[in-house]
Design a protein with these regions (language model features):
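Alpha-helical transmembrane segments and their helix-start/interface "positive-inside/aromatic belt" motifs
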Residues: 1-5, 71-72, 106-110
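Alpha-helical transmembrane segments of multi-pass membrane proteins
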Residues: 7-23, 80-87, 122
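Short aromatic-rich membrane-water interface segments that cap or initiate transmembrane helices
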Residues: 31-42, 102-110
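Interfacial helix-loop-helix junctions of multi-pass membrane proteins
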Residues: 90-104
Length: 145
């Protein structure tokens, strides 16, 4: 659920910022520019996912029962980083900046597919699993709080 929330909020904020920059005529190098090079926001998503992956390895590698709070934070971070990466899916698929061109639609399609998978996992899967167990006569065990 937290990954879905992080994904949705980040997607809305990112699309909002890029739309404002585009409408104000920021040009091809609008946004974050370091040393004359435009840094696309998917770079921050990739770095974030690398850090999260390493953190998950550390959490699983050294503790039998890692703190649930850390998993909540990392789930949110996963959603945030995924939104940053998939918002520019068309860029790394076409190897050129097509964000505002027709091919930019590929990013929207990737976002919808991934968002649907996250929503399914957060909302529909637990319900479907409970219904399945109910009809098979095997109730689900109580979840620890």
């Amino acid at each position: 659920m937290l990954a879905t929330l992080g994904f949705t909020v980040t997607l809305a904020v990112t699309r909002g910022i890029t739309t404002v920059l585009h409408k104000k005529g920021a040009g091809p190098n609008g946004g974050i520019v370091i040393g004359g090079v435009h840094i696309h926001h998917f770079v921050f998503g990739m770095v974030g996912l690398i850090v999260l992956g390493y953190l998950w390895l550390l959490l699983y590698g050294f503790e039998d029962k890692p703190p649930r709070r850390l998993f909540r934070y990392t789930a949110s971070g996963y959603g945030v980083c995924s939104a940053l990466i998939l918002d520019e899916f068309a860029l790394w698929l076409n190897l050129r900046d097509v964000y505002w061109e027709r091919q930019g639609r590929e990013s929207v399609e990737a976002l919808l597919i991934f968002g649907g998978i996250l929503l399914w996992g957060a909302l529909i899967y637990p319900f479907a699993l409970a219904v399945w167990h109910h009809f098979r006569g095997h109730p689900l065990p109580a979840r620890p709080r």
